[in-house]
Structure formats: C-alpha cells, structure tokens
C-alpha cells in the first residue's frame, strides 16, 4: 500500500484486525461513514454474511487476469469475490528417510500404497530409528490439520460424486475412508494415540525437523520453517505428495489446492472510490512492484497471469502435478457450517484417538451436527 501511494499519489489506508477478530472488526468498520472499500471473506460461508455489500466484479481487469474461474465466487450471475492467494497442502515427505526405508515416492500412488509403506516402517521402527508419521496432535495449534484439512477430503469426494459445490446436509459417504486415514496417522506415528490430545503443532514440526518421521501433513506455508537459513533441509531432501484416502482416481489426484482469502469490493462506496480500489487491486497482481511484494515480502502464491515464480518447493510440486494433468483437490472446507462444527469433530476425533470415545461419535459430529447447524 505504501509503495502504491509513493508511485501513484493515491492514499491507501489499511486497517489490520487482531488475530481471530477479522469478522468483528469488519462489522464495526462497515458501520462507519468512511467504511472500507476493500474487504475479504473466507469462502462461501463468509460470503453469505456480506454478499449484499459486494460489487459485481464481472468485466473488471483483475478478473480477466485470474488463471482459473474456480478461484472466484459468484452470487447468481455476479462475480462478487476473487481469491488472491492460493496454497496447497498434502503429505510433506522426507525423501532421504523414505529411501532409507527402501522406498521412493514412485512407490506411493494410492492409499493402499501409503498404508503398506507406513505399516512396514512401523514394523521396523526400532531398527530404522524413525516413524512413518509425525504426531497428529489434537491441541488447538494442530487439530485444524485433521478436523478441517483432512476432513476436506471426504467432503470434496462427496461433492464430486453428487455434482454439487455445497450442501445443507452432508451424507458422510466417505467417512469410512476418513477413519482409515486417521487410523493410519495415529497408529503409525512418533507417539501412542493416547498422547495426541496434548501434542502441539510445534511438536509435530520439531519431530519432522529432527528426522523422527517420514511424513508430515501440512501445507506450502510450512516451507520456510523447514528449508533455509539454519534449517536442516534443502529442496533436494523434501517433496509433497497427495493425501490419498482410497477414493476416486488416485493415479490422477493432485495436492489439495485452494484459498480462504477472497477480495470483495464494497458496492456502497462512491464510484470514484470503487474505481480507485479496483486500480489498486489490479496493481497488486499485475505490476512488477506489486507482484514482487506479494511473492517475496508476503510469500504469497497469487493465481494471476503476471505472478512471479515462487521459490517455494511445495508450490513448484503443485504446479508440476497440475502440468502433468493431475486434478487438484479443491478446498471445500470453506463450506463447513462453522467453527463450532469443526470443534465438535475435533473433540470427537480426540476422544476416539484417546480410546475414550468411538468412531460413531465422529460420524454424529460430522453428519448430524452439519444438518442442525
């Protein structure tokens, strides 16, 4: 914003919300006479609260530069939100340890393959000196990886099978597959399932950094925590493979790629302010300075034609898989009913791992609470 003002003379004011307070801050800012002209939503559920404020971006220059229509949100025929950063997640893989166990990523092209490799590593864990998976921590710093990111896969495949993009009543068609993958994580890990309730995101990362496990479910945002100054890995040591759950065309499955960050323009603003906002957005994603700031300063991968090439290995893997014709798994978790719903699933998963709850409680939290919410 500062660089844009220096270049164009157009003042840009940025209001930053405290962590976890974006929606509350936006509500108070939108009630003011000088309400923001640019704001963001996290996906279809977030958009539902704000769609009456969203300017139709159809025909705008920024929409014309978007690399895929799947990164825009519509309300009827109107395009009302544009994803401005995309990320991928999957199984971050320590290739060196995998090779020590006698395998390469070419041996893992399905859930059945992954299960075979993981269980073989577990059988030889003492001899090898490492586990298959880092701890599937269910502390709040880590549980989103399972109650949200892993849970995305059964939702995505159900939507694909039913030809829909969201639903008021999830059926849970693929929850057995969700169970199989969660079981694989918790039974082939650095620790006992009963210890997972207290395990954190840092625990999981540190286990991976210390070569204690081959696989670590996380995303492209984790790259700088693993590679670079003072970090133990180089790009040659790591890769990312898809999260296979035994559904669909696994041979052609890509990483889970999408966004929870969409720009919207306030249609209540003066037209001159709307036009100035559209110019600023376009500058961010098309100019040399804007795209460099997005890529280098913020580490964003932006889904626009003029994007800078990312130095991030996991982004390169995603691009390579897509170029090979693999289908990325869309981020459908933005259609989950609420944080409350996710927490219900997380609590049920934690109890299941600890042995104090059964899988039926997970199914109830997933299916029944989706309907009631």
Report residues per predicted region.
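Conserved C-terminal helix/tail region of periplasmic/extracytoplasmic solute-binding proteins
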Residues: 11, 99, 123, 289-291, ...
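Short, solvent-exposed loop/beta-turn-alpha elements that line the ligand-binding surface or hinge
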Residues: 56-69, 133, 137-140, 155-180, ...
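A structural signal for short loop-to-beta-strand junctions that line the ligand-binding cleft
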Residues: 28-29, 36-37, 63-98, 129-131, ...
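Extracytoplasmic/periplasmic solute-binding protein
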Residues: 80-84, 89, 115-167, 213
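Extracytoplasmic "Venus flytrap"/periplasmic binding protein-like
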Residues: 3-68, 80, 96-102, 109, ...
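Extracytoplasmic/periplasmic substrate-recognition and gating elements
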Residues: 101, 190, 230-296
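Hinge/lid segment of periplasmic solute-binding proteins
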Residues: 42-92, 145, 149-151, 237-242
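Glycine-centered hinge/linker elements that transmit conformational signals in sensory
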Residues: 118-119, 164-198
């Amino acid at each position: 914003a500062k660089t844009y003002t220096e270049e164009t003379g157009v003042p840009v004011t940025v209001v930053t919300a405290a962590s976890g307070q974006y929606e509350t801050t936006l509500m108070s800012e939108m009630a003011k006479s000088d309400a923001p002209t640019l704001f963001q939503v996290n996906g279809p559920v977030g958009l539902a609260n704000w769609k009456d404020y969203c300017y139709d971006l159809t025909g705008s220059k920024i929409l014309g530069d978007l690399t895929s229509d799947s990164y825009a949100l519509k309300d009827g025929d109107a395009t009302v939100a544009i994803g401005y950063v995309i990320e991928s997640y999957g199984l971050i893989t320590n290739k060196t340890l995998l090779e020590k166990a006698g395998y390469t990523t070419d041996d893992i092209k399905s859930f059945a393959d992954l299960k075979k490799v993981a269980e073989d590593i577990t059988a030889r864990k003492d001899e090898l000196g490492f586990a298959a998976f880092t701890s599937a921590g269910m502390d709040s710093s880590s549980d989103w990886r399972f109650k949200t990111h892993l849970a995305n896969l059964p939702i995505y495949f159900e939507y694909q099978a039913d030809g829909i993009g969201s639903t008021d009543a999830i059926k849970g068609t693929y929850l057995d597959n969700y169970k199989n993958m969660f079981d694989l994580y918790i039974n082939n890990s650095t620790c006992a399932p009963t210890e997972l309730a207290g395990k954190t995101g840092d625990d999981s990362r540190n286990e991976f950094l210390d070569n204690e496990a081959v696989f670590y479910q996380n995303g492209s945002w984790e790259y700088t925590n693993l590679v670079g100054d003072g970090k133990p890995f180089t790009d040659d040591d790591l890769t990312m493979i898809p999260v296979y759950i035994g559904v669909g065309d696994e041979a052609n499955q890509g990483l889970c790629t999408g966004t929870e960050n969409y720009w919207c323009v306030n249609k209540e603003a003066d037209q001159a302010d709307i036009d100035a906002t559209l110019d600023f957005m376009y500058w961010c994603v098309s100019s040399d300075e804007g795209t460099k700031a997005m890529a280098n300063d913020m580490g964003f991968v932006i889904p626009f034609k003029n994007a800078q090439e990312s130095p991030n290995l996991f982004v390169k893997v995603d691009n390579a898989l897509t170029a090979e014709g693999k289908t990325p798994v869309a981020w459908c978790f933005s259609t989950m009913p609420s944080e409350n719903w996710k927490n219900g699933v997380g609590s049920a998963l934690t109890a299941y791992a600890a042995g104090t709850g059964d899988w039926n409680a997970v199914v109830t939290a997933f299916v029944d609470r989706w309907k009631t919410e």
